[in-house]
Amino acid sequence: MICPVCGFENLTGAEVCDNCGADLAGGGVPQPTLSFHGRLLGEHLDDLGAPPPLTVSPETPVDVAIARMQAAEADCVLVTVDDRLVGIFTDRDAVLKVAGKPIDAHQVGDFMTPDPVVLRHDDPIALAINKMAVGGFRHIPIVQGGVPTGVVTARDVFHHLAETLD
């Protein structure tokens, strides 16, 4: 059964979408009551214009990854092996997991979040908001065929919402 909210193909008979958690047994997609809601369901992550992601390998020294994040004014780096996403390392990881440890002796793979939740470039912005709220995430990688193409951030979503409300 195809989810009417995110387009994910679920197993026949599923009552809840495995991708976004939408109710599949409730008789369809809830209709937006405000034009604002319709835009969130109709606009996709491509509309946010996320730049290409910063990537590092799991073997990258933590201090090098942090320096790259600082230089690019980025909140995270995506961790890849052979161009495939294997993890994410964020500014929050640096503060909560790395602070107080000798960073030159550790690699990003020691502190990254492995196998992060991901989205596709054609997923609705509403799905990103849902996953961030439910999972407590501020950064979600965007992938195409397992290859990272961007990162949607809470900041991106808030800026977009502010523009939408103007």
Model-assigned labels for residue ranges:
Residues 1-166:
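Tandem CBS (Cystathionine beta-synthase) repeat/Bateman regulatory domains
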